[in-house]
From Swiss-Prot:
Enzyme Commission code: 3.1.3.3, 3.1.3.16
Family of this protein: Belongs to the HAD-like hydrolase superfamily. SerB family.
Signal peptide: none
Effect of residue 18 to A: Does not bind L-serine and correspondingly no oligomeric transitions is observed in the presence of L-serine
Domain notes: Folds into three domains, i.e. two ACT domains occurring in tandem at the N-terminus followed by the classical phosphatase (PSP) domain. The PSP domain alone is capable of hydrolyzing L-phosphoserine, albeit with much reduced efficacy. The ACT domains are involved in amino acid binding and play an important role in modulating enzymatic activity.
PROSITE patterns, sorted: ACT
Localization annotation: Secreted; Host cytoplasm, Host cytosol
Species for this entry: Mycobacterium tuberculosis (strain ATCC 25618 / H37Rv)
Name the UniProt record assigns to this protein: Phosphoserine phosphatase SerB2
Consequence of changing residue 188 to A: No effect on enzymatic activity
UniProt-annotated binding residues for Mg(2+): 185, 187, 341
Outcome of substituting residue 273 to A: Completely abolishes enzymatic activity. Decreases enzymatic activity by 60%
Length: 409
């Protein structure tokens, strides 16, 4: 049997129907074996690479080259043909993926990311755009040398702060694609604002409560103590204010899109909140969430007593709730995601397979796997590998695509 060699055929030019067909009709006539095919189209411009195996005399002869060139030139594109014996047939998979999100991503910002990557000997294997709304998003798949993941994360965290973009580094492999359960904090994450402050406004105690809340979110005050102190300011209010506040809740921009898309993907979705069940449950029903963990306000004769009943869902309680829900649905912890914004979310994000800090306080950003700084909850989807195109393609066949104009920053 004659020895065989590898030949790489690279086609470039404006994409059009019939290019692939024209090429493979010629290759079929020469009886070559197909080893690999890769194709990308950027703004209508095609790059098609075909790796084939053929006898040495065919590779070095003129017939294959002339026939391929004639076919490709006939459809108005260019082609290059070269021996490729020294390269692997299938590339080794990337080790990590880097997400860059911004409004906008400037050339300077991306240059800084690329410099940070190159300085550590990290190779960029693949780049693609994943979003043009509500932020610009890019995904880079990279190969990181052993021992360089930590330094890479440190370097890119510095770049993100200096260039005003979000940069996240995640392992790239099977585990990255197997997330199955996600939990959200409620206040300032799933919804805008703090529910306790809305209730306190009804009691004329919003200033006092806001100060306690800020201290707790910064990690300066034990959450259980802060909750009890804040709830105490509500004593004497009629329980009907709870329903009034529930009706006034405004979802975080992108929240419906996020939950709708995750449900399509088969995720179990829920909330774990230091807020109050009677306010959260109507929202959970509306969004068709699978589970809720939150605190319970004590009501006697239709009046708030200023106390909570039952176990307090505090910082350790949030992590426990995540573990309990994961166990209930048979989901390993490495396949869970948690999203939050405050210091009381630290344990929950640390327990999750992927912990995402959303417009978060510094204490949480320091321990999270990824941080998002734009007020659009659907940016969470991009960190899970879902593109804006995929989101809108699914919406187009269901509820329709809707983009709300975003004012310039």
């Amino acid at each position: 049997m004659p020895a065989k060699v590898s030949v790489l055929i690279t086609v470039t030019g404006m994409d059009q129907p019939g290019v692939t067909s024209a090429l493979f009709e010629v290759l079929a006539q020469h009886g070559v074996e197909l080893l690999n095919v890769e194709q990308v189209v950027i703004r209508g411009r095609l790059t098609l690479g075909v790796l084939v195996s053929c006898p040495l005399d065919v590779a070095d002869g003129t017939a294959l080259r002339d026939d391929v060139a004639a076919a490709i030139h006939g459809v108005g594109l260019d082609v290059a043909i070269e021996r490729s014996d020294d390269l692997p047939i299938i590339r080794q998979p990337s080790t990590h993926t880097i997400f860059v999100l911004g409004r906008p991503i400037t050339a300077g910002a991306f240059s800084a990311v690329a410099r940070g990557v190159a300085a550590l000997g990290v190779n960029i294997d693949f780049i693609r755009g994943i979003s043009d709304y509500p932020v610009t998003g890019l995904e880079l798949r990279v190969s990181v040398p052993p021992g360089c993941v930590g330094p890479l994360q440190i370097a890119l965290t510095k770049v993100a702060a200096e260039e005003h973009v979000d940069v996240a580094v995640e392992d790239y492999g099977l585990a990255w694609r197997t997330k199955r359960l996600i939990v959200f904090d409620v206040d300032s994450t799933l919804v805008q604002g703090e529910v306790i402050e809305m209730l306190a406004a009804r009691a004329g105690a919003q200033g006092q409560v806001a100060a306690i809340t800020e201290a707790a979110m910064r990690g300066e005050l034990d959450f259980a103590e802060s909750l009890q102190r804040r709830v105490a300011t509500l004593a004497g209010l009629p329980a009907t204010v709870i329903d009034d506040v529930a009706e006034q809740l405004e979802l975080m921009p992108g929240a419906r899109t996020t939950i709708r898309t995750l449900r399509r993907l088969g995720f179990r979705c829920g909330v774990v909140s230091g807020g109050f069940r009677r306010i959260i449950e109507p929202l959970a029903r509306e969004l068709m969430l699978d589970f809720v963990a939150s605190n319970e306000l004590e009501i006697v004769d239709g009046i708030l007593t200023g106390r909570v009943v039952g176990p307090i869902v505090d910082r350790p309680g949030k992590a426990k709730a995540l573990r309990d829900f994961a166990s209930q649905y048979g989901v390993p912890m490495e396949q869970t995601v948690a999203v939050g914004d405050g210091a009381n979310d630290i344990d929950m994000l640390g327990a999750a397979g992927l912990g995402i800090a959303f417009n978060a306080k510094p204490a949480l950003r320091e321990v999270a796997d990824a941080s998002l700084s734009h007020p659009y909850l659907d940016t969470v989807l991009f960190l899970l590998g879902v593109t804006r195109g995929e989101i809108e393609a699914a919406d187009a066949g269901d509820c329709g695509v809707r983009r709300v104009e975003i004012p310039a920053d």
